[in-house]
Curated annotation (Swiss-Prot):
Residues 1-27, 541-555, 883-910, 1324-1338 have a biased composition (Polar residues). Present in egg (at protein level). It is found in: Nucleus; Cytoplasm, Cytoskeleton; Chromosome; Midbody. It comes from the Eukaryota. Regulates microtubule dynamics during mitosis by stimulating kif2c. Probably recognizes and binds to some phosphorylated proteins and promotes their ubiquitination and degradation. This is Microtubule-associated tumor suppressor 1 homolog.
Length: 1338
């Protein structure tokens, strides 16, 4: 679960972002409008830089404390304006959460303003200290795991009772971790998204986030704030963008919009709060004039298919626009309220979660209602949390935890609207003017309810859509915008032709029956009070219209809301445009929005800009179905130039839907009939159904229309079939520069629309009914999308005739602001127009534009001829009625516009009305002639096609008279024009009521301006007081400098006295020390002499003793050494003689034993020889006998002879082997003997060698001893010589000392050095050191 709490007020802007809700730790850098310490690197203007840096926070760091912090000093970029920019010192303050430092200081002010002038420091510090007391307590501990501390800290900031807090109510931007929100409300799921979130969450994550971080060129004079809270229980990546509404000095408190986006298959309730707050400090606004000004609302379309490229069109509409993401119909509920209670200013921000999710319902769609109040000052999150907890009791929310569907009870489809109404009354403050609630009536319809192909369920996504303000122009980006506009225009043509609906009364939607009773409860807002309306109404200054932005085209803040057509170009091209926009860079998006905001700031647009406002609710259904036959690659293959040009035209169209959605006043509201039919709409609410053909959509299209009493009575009175009513509702003027492209664009767009229409037959049917409720003058516009079966042709009495194939034909006149092109869906809507008081030049320009657009609306209608329109009966009345509405929408329109439209409307229907410049109307007319000819040919073909349907009737009936056909056409045209006139009358009445509401709003703005003037006076008085304080401070500074100089003089005098005393004391000490030194020297000399004599005597005695001992020791060493040498020699000689004798004896013994053994061996050899000879003789004898026997046996038996021979050969072999064995035995005997002798000899040799080695070692030892003795002898001799020399020297020194004693010169330092007491000891040391080696041998 993730949390986003972002407020921007009074030039305070801070953004909080969260990465999937893992660990939210935000680092926001404060910015000042003039005193910036954050340089804008990209040169995109001093706009808001998104400094929200998310540090990954480990789990063990979650519970650490946070404090608010801002830099110590601010660098001044420009001269300080004390009156205009007194509050500009502190802009936004940071939430820094470094991992090492979890505490932040909440000072927004210069704490170390050392770089600035002294005057600036005094005044700035004065003001900033007040703001610091007001806004930032010294330290506000914010613990992320506990919401109470946050609420207390923030409440302390916002609830300050100081005057500055009343002037500029500032709010904190706090990023709370998931623990805080879980404790605050764990079961609330809020997600701000306008369309299916699964597509945008993945494919447009970076682009949509970048839009929020776009630098805004904004004035320091006034600002609006949006408070967006975004929670997500799912594991999807949460995308939130800081929503910023910044307006110039001329912008009033504008209305807040809430649209209940019926997003199917989403498990998250949508909540987007837009808390706008004008800068109450009129004195701070340089040249502030609180006239009506345009506001920008960013429109975000649906995105469904997560596998496709997202094609969302982010467009800022001119005047007030609504976030149009409805899939079918939108209920506009407007309550223009004026709250006089001034004490509520510092209370609740107008934020509430209104989600009626029934726990028992199983409807596939989720009811997502958003709610935003207008101009409610931002307050502490403490109060917000309390309100959320209070509203929890009244609003049942089923926590889905990422389920496939967020279920809504059909019994209470819009029950939250009444709760929102109650919340409006509670949350409205002094600045609250209008509250526009756009609730979704078809919230119970799922995306897969009526589609043959299952659509992927939307995944949970959260992103806040920023509201842009005036941004500086950028010439380079303007070209890109034109190309994108043109591309989006072409895509819109291709998309609108694919809408196919098929009504059947078999299966109504689930929540359509119960919605009626609940809807009546919702529409119960109090009637606005017009008592305080004053006659003073500010007129808009003349402004130049600049190029529009594909993302933003502006609408007036008080234009009446109405239902937009499903096929309105303001909404239909948005999915395709987003597909193109995803390719673009973040910088392009930022710069586009900057240019559009600058355009909105400078252009002059009357409030009478009227669009087909039902586009805002209905387009996500049909425009996306229109894409069914358009391949995805084809949408993306358009070149950059085509994309830019299409987007430029679409921005003007989208302004109409926004204007209609926002300018609805207290009375305008949509009945429950609308929500029921929206719930029974056959169109799936999938935001991206481009891959599905219209045929597949037709298969499961189920519609069961419902009507309320007022509507049915009116239809019965008009005698019309309510199911087939086709009426042109809106033609509204727009400035020529904003809405009219060149004729070349017209030609391209017409051709593109014709091509798309020719290949895509679409069937649509819309009924628009008007109902007035009570005295509030509510406009009830209901759109029902349905298509009759092809077999049964139907005739619409109100709107004309249907074709024999059952295709209703509707005429769509183009709105002058660019939303009039309603191609190929034939789903017209009725929009309401509202004229507000404007300057004479603006009225004239709008009238001239109206006349041009009315002609264009008829001239460009012939491109629908390729759409198989069977009869001209159905066409002529519709187009004529469209021209009439164009004429009647402005009271003082030119008469030529009506004439031109009536002459051209013969055989035309407006599939896409593309505004062109008045100069370029010639080529457009020439093109329309060709289109008319083609449409006539198509009509004939269609007539031929219809003939086989009734072959029997054609054969029996006579041919139809052409005059009667013309007569019926004229009757149908007249009937349609009557209906149009009645509709226009109703529009006029409703617009009058809306104008009254606008007067209330303007009066409120005037009151606020007066209050701000009072506050400015108070601030100027305070500034004068501060200047007086500055003068006092300067006087006190001079006085302190004088006192300082006096103190310095006194200090110098005292220092001089102290120095003199010090010198006197030093001289006294020197004299005393000299006297003391002389006395001590005399004493030391006497002591030294006595001690020297003692030491001399002692040393002499020691030297004598040493000499005697040394001589005795030397003699003893010499005698002992001689004796040892003699003994060693004798021992060596004895050992040698013994060894020689032993060796001789052993040699003799060995020789004797050898000789004996040799004799014995010889004897044995002789004996063996004798034995051998005897054996040989025996063998010879035996052989002779054998021979004799052989001879005998040969004679007897040859076998026996053979055996005898074999025996003889074997005996010979045995003898040979025996001889060899004897020889080997002899050799073995000899070897054994040799081995024995060798072993004995080896042992003897080893013994002899050991003895020799021992003798050698002894000899070596003897030699070493002899050498050692010789060296010791030499050392002793040397030591004796040294001692003799030392004795001589000592004697000499003794003589010198005696001489000195006699002469008395011991005190002289030069003479004392040779007779120092340490010198006599050296001879003794030397003698001791030399005598020590003599002792060591012992």
């Amino acid at each position: 679960m993730s949390v986003q709490t972002a407020t921007t007020e009074n030039r305070f802007q801070s953004t909080l972002d969260d990465n999937n809700g893992n660990n939210s730790e935000s680092k926001n850098i404060a910015r000042c409008p003039k005193y910036e310490w954050n340089a804008n690197v990209n040169d995109q203007g001093p706009g808001v830089i998104d400094h929200s840096i998310l540090d990954q926070q480990s789990d063990n760091e979650i519970n650490k404390h946070y404090l608010l912090q801002s830099p110590n000093a601010l660098e001044l970029d420009s001269t300080l304006d004390y009156i205009g920019n007194a509050a500009g010192h502190c802009d936004t303050f940071n939430l820094k959460a470094d991992k090492g430092c979890k505490t932040v200081n909440s000072s927004l002010l210069h704490e170390n303003p050392g770089e600035e002038d002294e005057t600036v420091d005094y005044i700035n510090n004065e003001l900033c200290n007040k703001m610091q007391d007001t806004l930032c307590p010294p330290s506000i501990p914010i613990q992320t795991s506990a919401s109470d501390e946050i609420h207390k800290g923030l409440g302390a900031i916002t609830d300050r009772g100081s005057a500055y807090n009343k002037i500029a109510e500032q709010s904190l931007c706090v990023q709370e971790s998931t623990d805080y929100l879980c404790k605050m409300e764990p079961k609330w799921t809020v997600q701000a998204f306008f369309g299916d979130a699964d597509k945008l969450c993945r494919n447009e994550a970076n682009n949509l986030v970048d839009i929020s971080t776009t630098d805004h060129k904004y004035d320091h004079n006034s600002s609006f704030g949006i408070f967006t809270l975004s929670l997500d229980f799912s594991d999807e990546k949460c995308m939130r963008e800081d929503s910023l509404v910044l307006s110039g000095s001329e912008k009033p408190l504008s209305a807040s919009i809430l649209e209940g986006s019926a997003l199917p298959n989403s498990s998250i309730d949508v909540f987007t709060g837009s808390v706008k707050k004008t800068d109450n400090i009129d004195g701070f606004c340089q040249g502030a004039e609180l006239s009506l000004r345009d506001l920008d609302y960013l429109e975000v379309p649906h995105q469904k298919d997560s596998t496709e490229t997202p094609q969302s069109k982010l467009s800022l509409t001119s005047e007030h626009s609504v976030f149009t993401s409805e899939t079918s119909e939108v209920m506009l509920e407007v309550d223009a309220r004026r709250v006089m209670d001034k004490t509520v200013e510092s209370h609740l921000p107008n934020l509430r979660l209104s989600s009626n999710v029934g726990k028992e319902d199983s409807a596939p769609g989720a009811s997502l209602e958003e709610f935003v109040s207008g101009s409610v000052p931002a307050v502490a999150p403490e109060e917000l949390a309390s309100n959320l907890i209070k509203d929890k009791n009244t609003i049942k929310n089923k926590e889905s935890h990422g389920e496939a569907h967020s279920l809504e009870s059909p019994a209470r489809p819009d029950s939250s609207s009444s709760e929102l109404k109650d919340l409006l009354s509670n949350l409205s403050g002094q600045n609250c003017e209008d509250t526009f609630i756009i609730s979704s009536p078809n919230s119970g319809i799922g995306s897969k309810a009526f589609t043959s192909t299952p659509l992927p369920e939307s995944k949970n996504m959260t992103f806040s859509v920023p509201v842009l303000e005036s941004i500086t122009e950028n010439n380079e980006l303007q070209q890109n915008l034109d190309a994108i506009k043109y591309d989006l225009e072409g895509l819109r043509h291709s998309s609108d032709s694919n809408i196919v609906t098929k009504p059947t009364n078999k299966k109504p939607a689930v929540g359509s029956v119960v919605g009626k009773a609940k809807k009546n409860e919702v529409i119960s807002f109090p009637k606005p009070s017009f008592k305080n309306v004053k006659a003073k109404v500010l007129t808009r200054p003349s402004l130049q219209a600049k190029d529009s932005n594909p993302y933003a085209s502006k609408t007036s803040p008080r234009s009446p809301p109405s239902l937009s057509n499903a096929s309105s170009p303001a909404q239909s091209p948005r999915p395709l445009s987003s597909a193109v926009k995803t390719v673009q860079k973040r910088s392009v998006i930022n710069q586009d929005m900057k240019t559009e905001a600058a355009i909105a700031k400078s252009q002059k647009q009357p409030i009478t800009k009227q669009l087909f406002p039902t586009h805002s609710a209905h387009v996500p259904t049909h425009s996306k179905h229109a894409l069914g036959k358009v391949p995805r690659a084809a949408a993306l293959k358009h070149t950059q130039n085509e994309t830019e040009r299409a987007s430029s035209s679409n921005s003007t169209r989208s302004s109409g839907s926004a204007a209609a959605a926002l300018t609805c006043t207290a009375g305008s509201r949509v009945t429950e009939n609308k929500s029921e039919k929206a719930k029974t709409s056959a169109k799936p609410s999938a935001p991206n159904v481009r891959l599905m053909g219209p045929n597949k959509i037709e298969q499961k299209g189920i519609i069961q229309p419902h009507f309320d009493k007022a509507q049915s009575l009116k239809e019965a009175k008009e005698g019309t079939v309510s199911a087939d009513m086709d009426i042109l509702a809106n033609i509204v003027p727009l400035p020529t520069k904003l809405a009219i492209p060149s004729s070349r664009n017209l030609h391209k767009e017409l051709i593109l629309g014709i091509k798309n229409v020719a290949s895509q037959p679409a069937k649509g049917r819309v009924q628009t009914t008007v109902q007035r409720r009570g005295s509030l003058g509510k406009n009830i516009l209901t759109i029902r999308v349905s298509s009759p079966p092809r077999e049964k042709p139907q005739v619409t009495v109100e709107g004309g005739l249907n074709s024999p194939k059952g295709r209703p034909i509707s005429v769509k006149a183009s709105a002058a602001n660019g939303t009039g092109s309603l191609p190929r869906t034939r789903l017209p809507c009725r929009g309401t127009t509202l004229q507000r008081t404007a300057s004479v030049s603006s009225v004239c320009s709008t009238q001239s534009e109206l006349s041009n657009l009315s002609t264009r609306s008829t001239t460009t209608t012939s491109s629908i001829k390729t759409e198989d329109i069977p009869t001209a009966k159905c066409i002529r009345p519709n187009s004529a009625s469209g021209a009439l509405t164009a004429k009647s929408s402005i009271p003082r329109g030119r008469s030529q516009s009506l004439k031109v439209t009536q002459t051209v409307t013969g055989t035309k229907k407006s599939p896409s009305i593309i505004p062109t410049l008045p100069r370029s109307s010639g080529p457009a007319l020439s093109l329309t002639k060709k289109l008319e000819a083609r449409s006539l040919q198509n009509v004939e073909k269609n007539k031929q096609k219809t003939s086989p349907r009734g072959p029997v009737t054609q054969a029996q009936t006579p041919p139809v008279d052409p005059k009667s056909i013309e007569l019926t056409k004229c009757k149908a045209a007249c009937e349609q024009q009557r209906g149009v006139i009645e509709n226009l009358k109703n529009l006029l009445s409703s617009s009058n009521q809306r104008f009254e509401a606008l007067t209330v709003v303007v009066q409120q703005l005037i009151n606020q301006r007066e209050e701000t003037l009072k506050k400015r006076k108070a601030l100027s008085q305070e500034l004068l007081n501060l200047r007086g304080d500055l003068v006092c401070a300067s006087s006190t500074c001079e006085r302190l400098e004088k006192e300082k100089n006096e103190l310095l003089k006194a200090y110098e005098g005292i220092l001089q006295k102290v120095k003199e005393e010090h010198h006197a004391e030093l001289s006294d000490l020197e004299e005393k020390l000299k006297q003391f030194y002389t006395g001590e020297c005399e004493k030391l000399q006497s002591i030294f002499i006595e001690e020297a004599e003692k030491y001399k005597n002692e040393l002499q005695e020691k030297v004598d003793d040493l000499n005697t001992t040394h001589e005795a020791y030397r003699l003893q060493a010499e005698t002992s050494q001689i004796e040892t040498i003699h003994t060693l020699k004798e021992d060596y000689e004895k050992s040698l003689t013994e060894l020689k004798d032993a060796k001789d004896k052993e040699n003799k013994i060995l020789e004797d034993s050898f000789k004996e053994k040799q004799a014995e061996v010889e004897k044995k050899i002789l004996e063996l020889k004798d034995v051998n000879e005897s054996l040989k003789e025996k063998l010879k004898y035996e052989e002779e006998q054998r021979k004799l026997t052989k001879e005998k046996s040969v004679q007897k038996n040859p076998q026996v002879m053979y055996l005898e021979q074999e025996l003889e050969s074997l005996k010979a072999v045995l003898e040979i082997k025996n001889e060899k064995l004897h020889q080997q035995d002899k050799k073995l005997m000899q070897v054994e003997k040799l081995v024995e002798t060798n072993t004995t000899l080896v042992e003897r040799l080893n013994k002899c060698q050991q003895e020799n080695e021992d003798l050698k070692a002894r000899m070596v030892n003897h030699v070493a001893l002899s050498r050692q003795l010789s060296t010791e002898q030499e050392v002793l001799q040397r030591s004796l010589e040294k001692e003799s020399k030392a004795n001589k020297r000592l004697s000499m020194e003794n003589e010198e000392l005696l001489w000195k004693l006699h002469n008395g010169d011991l005190c002289s330092p030069k003479k004392l050095s040779p007779s120092s007491p340490g010198i006599p000891f050296h001879p003794s040391r030397n003698s001791g050191s030399f005598s020590s080696p003599t002792v060591s041998p012992r």
